[in-house]
From Swiss-Prot:
This is Peptide deformylase. Gene3D superfamilies: Peptide deformylase. The gene is def. It is an enzyme of class 3 (hydrolase). CDD domains: Pep_deformylase. It comes from Opitutus terrae (strain DSM 11246 / JCM 15787 / PB90-1). Belongs to the polypeptide deformylase family.
């Protein structure tokens, strides 16, 4: 079942997610529906806020990515197909001390057709729980690190446009304002 992805200017995108405490069938079902929604939208990550649920849950799947990245999960390097798709709850990110910050173009399913360069640390460690509540430590870099940082920002009410340099944000500002107007108009037509 595909869920509706909320677009920019929906207030839920600015809400910090509540910590997940119940690792039950309802959580597994929500994660499954989020994965289906993300895949249908041709995305590589999706946060719960993007489907209107302000909780600390996101999903990531980079199996089809054509950009290199490295990972180590709980001290091992399992094949990518064994760790993807990832269901991440209650994440905490620590950028590596010696990592570089790179400016790379990002998009977002809540900002259709809007893209811009975003500075992010290249390598991170993320501590999280999976859908069963099992704790994990993931060290990663490249696209995987960028994707997780983008989704975890959503979980904290931070959007990729907030991280852009002023020049980049100014270049897309008209498109962002247009999207905000469309979202407001749609909310008036279909109040929750």
């Amino acid at each position: 079942m595909s869920l509706r992805i909320v677009h920019y200017n929906d207030p839920v995108l600015r809400r910090k997610g509540e910590k997940i405490t119940a690792f039950d069938k309802a959580l597994s079902q929500l994660a499954k529906e989020m994965l289906a929604t993300m895949q249908e939208a041709a995305g590589i990550g999706l946060a719960a806020q993007q489907i209107g649920r302000p909780v600390q849950l996101c999903v990531v799947d980079l199996r089809r990515a054509e950009i290199d990245f490295t990972w180590e999960l709980d001290g091992a390097k399992p094949p990518l197909d064994l760790i993807m798709p990832m269901i991440i709850t209650n994440p905490e990110i620590t950028p590596d001390r010696e990592t570089d910050v790179y400016l790379v173009e990002e998009g977002c399913l809540s900002f259709p057709k809007i893209r811009g360069d975003v500075p992010r640390p290249d390598a991170i460690t993320v501590r999280y729980q999976d859908e069963h509540g099992t704790p994990h430590t993931l060290h990663c870099d490249g696209l995987l690190a960028r994707c997780i940082q983008h989704e975890v920002d959503h979980l904290n009410g931070v959007l990729f446009i907030d991280r852009m340099e002023k020049k980049t944000r100014a270049a897309i500002d008209a498109d962002v304002k247009t999207l905000a107007k469309i979202t407001r108009a749609a909310a008036k037509l279909n109040p929750a």
